[in-house]
Design a protein with these regions (language model features):
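Extended, hydrophilic extramembrane loops/domains of integral membrane proteins
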Residues: 211-241
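Membrane-embedded segments
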Residues: 23-150
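Short glycine/serine/threonine/alanine-rich loop segments
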Residues: 79, 179, 221-224
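VWA/integrin I-like adhesion module and closely mimicked acidic/polar interface patches used
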Residues: 124-128, 134-135, 142, 160-215, ...
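C-terminal signal-anchor/stop-transfer transmembrane helix together with its immediate cytosolic
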Residues: 1-32, 243-279
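DG-centered beta-turn motif at the end of beta-strands
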Residues: 17, 45-47, 65, 83-88, ...
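Extracytoplasmic/secreted cell-surface and envelope-processing proteins
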Residues: 51-54, 91-94, 162-167, 191-194, ...
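A conserved amphipathic helix/loop scaffold
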Residues: 205, 235-250
Length: 279
């Protein structure tokens, strides 16, 4: 009986080393319920005015918009969500997915404002208005949503400082299936541009843009919510989607190499054998 532990250890050492040589991997693949009849696209305004904030160290409009987009995506776990940016045009950044890791990574690392920091502080030049919400007409025209998505939601995260929208926007959003549209506005009259650390005198928020945003929303049959009403916007999105058919979508989890752990485990019986030999 005393030889049994020795025999077991002699068998375990080559077995564990052989297993380690096979480089085993633990694959944490999971499945998630995904709606087959619904999709959403989140469009974030990346015009320079989205850098405005309440102070030099306060969060910018874009930072708050990214956070709100993350909150809204997590509130719709079964809805595939795509991401795009808006300035003079609309540019997709991520295809619709229910994998929150993808949307979180794109929101954190990819969506920003080009030319955010000028080479020298602007003191006399009034920023040019470049944002055009009329560019949203490309969403229904360019088939952002597949035919299978009968429930379509567009959420636009913007400060509403936009050029007037032309008739093309209204025509585009008359297509069927209809695209439900929510505008989530990030704006305050006291905000300024602090890109260089001091307020740029060339930029002062204009309250008149609120009416222009309301006009654009009316043209597409949408609704406008302020960032303080994020919960109301979330409820509106949830009510719009309701319930529907789903399918199980597999998602690859983290792949963990087990070779180091198996190799380490092989040293346990080996250490036992060395200990017995020295007795």
């Amino acid at each position: 009986m005393r030889r049994a532990p020795v025999a077991l250890s002699l068998a375990l050492v080559p077995a564990l080393l052989g297993l380690a040589a096979a480089q085993p991997v633990f694959d944490d693949t999971r499945t998630r319920s995904e709606r087959t009849d619904a999709q959403a696209f989140f469009v974030l305004d990346t015009s320079r005015s989205m850098l405005a904030s309440a102070g030099p160290r306060a969060e910018t409009r874009l930072e708050r918009a990214r956070q709100a987009a993350g909150v809204l995506q997590r509130a719709l776990p079964e809805i595939p969500v795509g991401l795009a940016v808006l300035n003079e045009g609309v540019f997709p950044y991520a295809f619709p997915t229910t994998d929150s890791r993808v949307t979180e990574a794109v929101l954190a690392d990819s969506i920003g404002i080009e030319g955010a920091r000028p080479e020298r502080p602007s003191t006399f030049v009034t920023p040019t208005l470049t944002t055009s919400l009329g560019a949203l007409a490309v969403v229904p025209r360019a088939n952002y949503f597949p035919r299978s998505a009968q429930r379509r939601l567009l959420v636009v995260f913007t400060d509403g400082e936009t050029k007037p929208a032309g008739p093309a926007l209204a025509r585009a959003f008359q297509r069927r299936p209809r695209i439900e549209t929510i505008f989530l506005r990030f704006w305050d009259a006291d905000e300024r541009l602090y890109v260089t650390g001091v307020a740029e005198p060339g930029y002062v928020p204009n309250p008149a843009f609120g009416a222009r945003l309301a006009e654009v929303s009316s043209v597409v049959g949408g609704r406008v919510f302020s960032e303080d009403d994020l919960e109301a916007a979330q409820n509106a999105a949830e009510d719009f989607f309701g319930s529907g058919p789903t399918k199980a979508r597999p998602f690859g989890g983290e792949r963990v190499a087990l070779m180091p752990y198996v190799t380490l485990a092989a040293f346990v019986p080996l250490a036992f054998l060395l200990w017995r030999r020295n007795l």
